[in-house]
C-alpha cells in the first residue's frame, strides 16, 4: 500500500495543489507542551499499566490514564469496552467531571473524573469501586450546557428521546417522536420500527436530532430534529418529503432517495449530515429549508473518507494522496474545501485509517480537530511505524493561519477486522483538554473467553 501511495501522490499532486493554502507561522498555540515536529517517533514497548494510575506516554510525554479493565463491565465481566463509534457523540460532561464508556452488550458505564489529577471515581448511585450503569443505548450525548444531563434513547422506547440526570438518577422523556406528524406516521410500540442510537445535540442545547423508522441501522428513512421552542421538523429520505411544526414543507431539493446509516447534527443546530446506506456519499440538510445537498463519493469533492461535523463546517480525510490530507469545508458549500495540512508529509503514506472528533469546536469552527490513525493489524505487524503520525493521537489546526499538528501519544491499537472494538476511535472533551480512546494496547490485553480480542478505554491529557 505504501509504494502504491507514492504513485498516487505523483499523479494527484497537480490536481490537488490548487487547494493548498495553509502555510506560514503557527497561530495561537492551544497545546504548548505538545510535540509539533514531523519526525518519525517509533513506539517504545510498554506493558499495559493498571487502571486508574496516571502515567506518561514514553514517546510524546503526555499524561495518560487507563480507565477500564476486565472487571469494569459488571454486566458482562471479562469483555471489551470501547468509545463511541463515530466521534460525534459527546462522551464528556461539559465540566469534565464525568465521562462514559460503552461495554459489550450495549451498556453505558459512567465514571466520575478529576481533571486536575486524572483520578477516576464512582458516581453517586453506583456501587463503590464500580461504574454507574446509565439506562440509555450506546452513542448517547452529554449536554454541552448542563454537565448533569445526558441525552439518548432506551431499548424499550427507541422512538422517544430521553434525558438522564445524574444528580437525581431520573430518566425522563424529552420527545416522543411518534407525535411529530411524520408521513407515513411512526407508530409507538411497533417493535419492527426503531431508531438509530445517534442522538446529537446542538451546542446551546436547543436542538436534538435522531434518525429512525427502520428495522435496524442502515434501514432508517426519517431524520427528526426537535427544537425545544419551535417543535419537530422531519425529512423522509425515501419520499423526499419534508414537514413538521415549523419551516417550509414540501419536497427536498435533491431527487436522490436513500436509506440512512447515521445522521449527525451540527453544533450550530442548523444542519444535519446524513450518511446514506447506498454508497452515495453523504447529504447535508439545511434544517430551516428544503435544501438537501449531496457530497458524492465520485467526482472531485473528496467526500468518501471518515469525517466529523463542527459548528457550521465539516472536516474529513480526503482519502487521496496521503493519510494526513485533511479537508475542511462549510456545510452550506460542500465543494468549497481547504486543505488543513500543507505541505503533505513526504514520501506519502496511504492506507492508514483516520478518525476525527471535534466536540471542542467553537462558533467560528477555528479550534483544532482531533483524531487518531491506525493500520489494519496485518500491515502494522509487517511494517511497524515508518512514518510520522502513524498509530498516533493528535490535533490539527483549523483556523487557516498554519498547518500545525499537535502530537500527544501512540494509541497502541491493532485493528483486527472484523472486531470493531480494536479500532482506536476517539472522543475529545468540550474544552479540548482530554481525549478518550479505545485500544488493545498492542494486543497485550489478550482475548476473551470466546477468543475475541479485548479492548479497554484510555484517556490522554492534551496540553
Model-derived features: where do they sit?
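Hydrophobic beta-strand positions that form the internal "hydrophobic ladder"
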Residues: 99, 150, 208, 272, ...
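Asp-box/WD-like beta-propeller blade repeats and closely related beta-sheet repeat scaffolds
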Residues: 125-215, 236-249
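Structural motif
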Residues: 106-113, 157-165, 215-225, 278-286, ...
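Beta-propeller domains
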Residues: 55-83, 88-95, 100-129
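Blade-level signature of beta-propeller repeat domains, shared across WD40, Kelch, NHL, RCC1
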Residues: 420-463
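Blade/loop signatures of beta-propeller domains
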Residues: 33-70
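Structural signature of eukaryotic scaffold interfaces centered on beta-propeller domains
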Residues: 82-95, 131-147, 191-204, 253-268, ...
Amino acid at each position: 500500500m505504501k509504494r502504491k501511495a507514492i504513485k498516487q501522490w505523483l499523479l494527484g499532486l497537480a490536481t490537488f495543489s490548487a487547494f493548498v493554502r495553509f502555510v506560514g507561522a503557527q497561530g495561537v498555540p492551544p497545546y504548548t507542551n505538545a510535540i509539533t515536529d514531523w519526525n518519525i517517533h517509533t513506539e517504545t514497548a510498554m506493558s499495559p499499566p493498571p487502571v486508574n494510575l496516571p502515567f506518561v506516554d514514553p514517546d510524546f510525554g503526555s499524561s495518560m490514564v487507563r480507565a477500564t479493565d476486565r472487571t469494569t463491565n459488571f454486566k458482562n465481566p471479562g469483555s471489551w469496552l470501547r468509545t463511541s463509534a463515530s466521534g460525534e457523540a459527546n462522551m464528556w460532561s461539559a465540566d469534565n467531571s464525568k465521562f462514559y464508556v460503552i461495554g459489550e452488550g450495549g451498556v453505558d458505564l459512567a465514571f466520575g473524573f478529576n481533571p486536575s489529577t486524572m483520578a477516576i471515581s464512582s458516581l453517586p448511585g453506583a456501587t463503590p469501586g464500580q461504574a454507574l450503569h446509565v439506562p440509555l443505548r450506546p452513542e448517547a450525548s452529554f449536554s454541552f450546557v448542563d454537565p448533569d444531563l445526558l441525552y439518548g434513547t432506551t431499548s424499550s422506547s427507541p422512538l422517544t428521546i430521553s434525558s438522564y440526570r445524574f444528580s437525581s438518577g431520573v430518566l425522563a422523556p424529552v420527545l416522543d417522536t411518534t407525535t411529530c406528524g411524520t408521513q407515513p406516521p411512526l407508530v409507538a410500540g411497533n417493535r419492527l420500527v426503531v431508531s438509530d442510537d445517534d442522538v446529537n445535540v446542538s451546542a446551546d442545547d436547543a436542538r436534538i436530532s435522531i434518525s429512525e423508522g427502520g428495522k435496524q441501522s442502515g434501514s432508517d428513512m426519517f431524520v427528526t430534529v426537535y427544537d425545544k421552542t419551535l417543535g419537530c421538523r422531519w425529512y423522509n429520505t425515501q419520499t423526499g418529503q419534508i414537514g413538521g411544526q415549523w419551516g417550509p414543507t414540501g419536497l427536498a431539493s435533491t431527487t436522490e432517495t436513500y436509506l440512512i446509516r447515521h445522521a449527525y447534527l451540527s453544533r450550530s443546530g442548523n444542519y444535519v449530515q446524513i450518511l446514506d446506506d447506498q454508497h452515495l456519499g453523504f447529504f447535508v440538510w439545511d434544517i430551516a429549508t428544503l435544501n438537501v445537498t449531496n457530497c458524492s463519493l465520485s467526482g472531485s469533492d473528496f467526500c468518501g473518507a471518515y469525517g466529523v461535523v463542527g459548528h457550521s463546517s465539516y472536516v474529513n480525510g480526503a482519502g487521496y494522496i496521503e493519510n494526513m490530507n485533511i479537508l475542511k469545508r462549510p456545510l452550506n458549500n460542500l465543494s468549497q474545501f481547504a486543505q488543513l495540512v500543507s505541505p503533505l508529509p513526504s514520501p506519502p503514506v496511504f492506507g492508514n485509517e483516520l478518525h476525527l472528533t471535534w466536540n471542542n469546536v467553537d462558533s467560528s469552527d477555528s479550534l483544532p480537530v482531533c483524531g487518531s490513525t491506525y493500520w489494519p493489524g496485518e500491515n502494522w505487524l509487517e511494517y511497524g511505524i515508518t512514518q510520522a503520525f502513524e498509530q498516533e493521537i493528535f490535533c490539527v489546526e483549523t483556523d487557516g493561519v498554519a498547518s500545525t499538528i499537535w502530537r500527544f501519544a501512540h494509541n497502541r491499537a491493532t485493528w483486527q477486522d472484523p472486531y470493531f472494538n480494536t479500532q482506536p476511535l476517539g472522543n475529545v472533551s468540550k474544552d479540548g483538554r482530554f481525549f478518550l480512546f479505545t485500544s488493545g494496547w498492542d494486543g497485550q490485553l489478550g482475548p476473551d473467553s470466546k477468543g475475541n480480542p479485548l479492548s479497554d478505554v484510555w484517556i490522554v491529557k492534551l496540553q
